[in-house]
Amino acid sequence: MHAYRTHTCGALRASDTGASVRVSGWIHRKRDHGGLVFIDLRDHYGLTQLVLHPETPGFDVVERLRAESVIKIDGEVVARDAAAVNPNLPTGEIEIRVSAVEVLSEAAELPLPVFGEPDYPEEIRLKHRYLDLRRETLHKNIVLRSRVIQSIRSRMFAQGFNEFQTPILTASSPEGARDFLVPSRLHPGKFYALPQAPQQFKQLLMVSGFDRYFQIAPCFRDEDLRADRSLEFYQLDVEMSFVTQEDVFAAIEPVMHGVFEEFSAGKPVSPIDGVHTFTNDFGATLEHRGFERLTYAQSMAWYGSDKPDLRNPIKMQDVSEHFRDGGFGLFAKILGADPKNRVWAIPAPTGGSRAFCDRMNSWAQGEGQPGLGYAFFSKDQNGWGGPIAKNLGEGFQPIADQLGLTHDDAVFFVAGDPAVFAKFAGLARTRVGTELKLVDEEQFKFCWIVDFPMFEWNEDEKKVDFSHNPFSMPQGGLEALETQDPLTIRAYQYDIVCNGYELCSGAIRNHKPEIMLKAFEVAGYGAEVVEEQFGGMLNAFRYGAPPHGGLAPGIDRIVMLLAEQVAIREVIAFPLNQQGQDLLMNAPAEAQDRQYKELYIRSAPPIKV
C-alpha cells in the first residue's frame, strides 16, 4: 500500500464499497455525534467523510486536533445510510470507517478559517495566503488559471505558432509606465530594467526570420494599482510576420472565443462566424466576420469609453442641433461658445420617473458635476416632464423621436467639450444601465476598438505626444506624418474589449526606419534620442524587416472574467496588495549594507517635510 494514499479524497464512489483504502488530507470539518466523530477530510481533489468510533486507535488524539491538521487514515469504504447521502458531493454516497489514524502535521489555532469561507480583511488573507488558497473558491480560481493557460497554449500551437522566451533583464524603454530597475553588480552605476512587455524582442524575432511567435510572458510596470491592475502580470504575447490587421484578427479571434466558450460555464460568448457591417470614420461601410468593431471615435461618442460594456444596450447620441436655436438657454449658450462643444443624450429605457431622475442627479453631484439635465415621461401629466422638456415644449418631441423614447423612458443630457465630459458621460451611461438593471450579466460580449489616434495633445507639456504604442504604423504612412495635422492621424492600433474590460492591445508595427524616425520627430523626439533608446531595433530594421503585427491579451483579466471576480488578486496565487506589498514574504524590504556596497549604490529615502 502507498505510504500516504491509495485514493484521493475526491475519488471514492459507491462502487468502492467494501474496499480497504488509505487517504491523507486536511481536517476540513469535525463533528462529534454521541461518541462518534465525523471528519470531512479534504485534499486538492475533494472531500471524503470519515467515521471514527471510540475504540479506533488514535481516537483520543483526533478528538483534540484542530481543523486544518493533516492526517493519514486507513479504513473500509462503507455505504452511507440513505438519509445521510449528500447529493452535493461526488463522494456523498460513501464514508470511510477508520481503523487506523496517523497525525502527519498538527495545525495551530487558525488566523483565518478555511471552512465556510467567511469574508476576512484582505490584509489577513494575503498575510496567510497559504490558508486562503485552501478555500474552495480561490483554490478553484487558481486551477482555472492553469487550465486556461493550457487551453491557450494548445490553441496557439494548433494555429502554427511557436513559443519562444525573451529576456527578463533588459534595457529601460518608455512604454507608458515607470520601469522596475535592477542595479548591475558587474557594471557599477548601470541598471537593467524588468520588461514592461517583450515589445522590442518580439519584433526582433520577426526581423530574425521567425513567423508566428507567442509566449505567456511576465511583465512588470511600476504604476498605480487598481482592482484590475497589478505591478506584475502575465500576457499572451503574440507577433506575426507578413500580416495585415485582418490577419491578426483572424488568428486571435478563434483563440479568445474558444477559451471563453470552453470555460464560460454555459454563458453565451460573442460569435465569430457571423457577418457584421462596419462604418469607419471616413464613411466607408465594410463587411467583416468575427467580433463586432467600433472605431475609437465611435466608442467614445456612443459609450463615453474606449472599453465599452456592450451588455448595456444604451447608446448615447449627439442631439446638439435641437438646442442651437434656443429653447433651453444654457445649452444654446454652451454650443455658441465653442464649435467643438456638443450636447449628448443618454437614453434611460424604463427610467421614466422623477424619483429616478432625482437619484441620478444626486449621483452626478456626488461625482463632482453640477448635475444632469433630464426629461422623463410624466404619467400624471400624460407628457414629457422635467426642466428641459418644459423649456422646449413641443420642441422636445423631435429629440424623443431621434432617441426612440417611449412613455416609460427618461433621458439625461451632458453638454460642453466632449474631450472633457466624455468620461463622465460614460460613467453616467453605466450608472443608468446598472440602476435600471439593463445589463445582461449572463454573457461575454466582445468587440474590437480600432483606428486609435496616433497622437494626442499633452496638456502638461504643451506638446504632441504618442497616444498609445509608439511603434505602431500610422495609417497613411510617411505621407500622413508629413502632410496631416498630427491629431487627425489614425494608427493601425486595436484593442479587444469584453464586458467593459480591455483584454488586449495590439498594432501593425512601424517596420520602416524613416517612418519610425518621422513619427518620433512629430512627438518631439530627435533622431539621437531614438537611436539611443531604440537603436537595437532601429538598426535591425535597416537590414530588411518584414511587415509585422501582433497583440497581447492579459491572462489575469481573462481568468478574472471567467472566474466572475472583480479583482485580479482573486486569480493570482500570491499577489501584492494595493500598496504593492507582499505581506506574506514581507516585500519590498530594506537591503543589507553588504548588498548596497556590492552594488555601489546608496539609498536616500524621501525627506518628510
Swiss-Prot record:
Q: Where does ATP bind?
A: R221, D222, E223, E502, G554, I555, D556, R557
SUPFAM superfamilies in the record: Class II aaRS and biotin synthetases, GAD domain-like, Nucleic acid-binding proteins
Q: Which reaction does it catalyse?
A: tRNA(Asx) + L-aspartate + ATP = L-aspartyl-tRNA(Asx) + AMP + diphosphate
TM segment ranges: none
What keywords are assigned to this protein? Aminoacyl-tRNA synthetase, ATP-binding, Cytoplasm, Ligase, Nucleotide-binding, Protein biosynthesis
Question: Where is L-aspartate bound in this sequence?
Answer: E175, R221, H468, R509
The record, for InterPro entries, names: Aa-tRNA-synt_II, aa-tRNA-synth_II, aa-tRNA-synth_II/BPL/LPL, Asp-tRNA-ligase_1, Asp-tRNA-ligase_1_N, Asp/Asn-tRNA-synth_IIb, AspRS_core, GAD-like_sf
Region: Aspartate, residue numbers = 199-202
Enzyme Commission code: 6.1.1.23
The protein's GO terms of the molecular function aspect are: aspartate-tRNA ligase activity; aspartate-tRNA(Asn) ligase activity; ATP binding; nucleic acid binding
Q: Does the keyword Cell membrane apply?
A: no
> Where is it chiefly localized?
cytoplasm
Record's subcellular location: Cytoplasm
Function of the protein? Aspartyl-tRNA synthetase with relaxed tRNA specificity since it is able to aspartylate not only its cognate tRNA(Asp) but also tRNA(Asn). Reaction proceeds in two steps: L-aspartate is first activated by ATP to form Asp-AMP and then transferred to the acceptor end of tRNA(Asp/Asn).
Listed under subunit, the entry gives: Homodimer.
User: In which family does this protein belong, per the annotation?
Assistant: Belongs to the class-II aminoacyl-tRNA synthetase family. Type 1 subfamily.
Annotated protein name in UniProt = Aspartate--tRNA(Asp/Asn) ligase
The organism is Caulobacter sp. (strain K31)
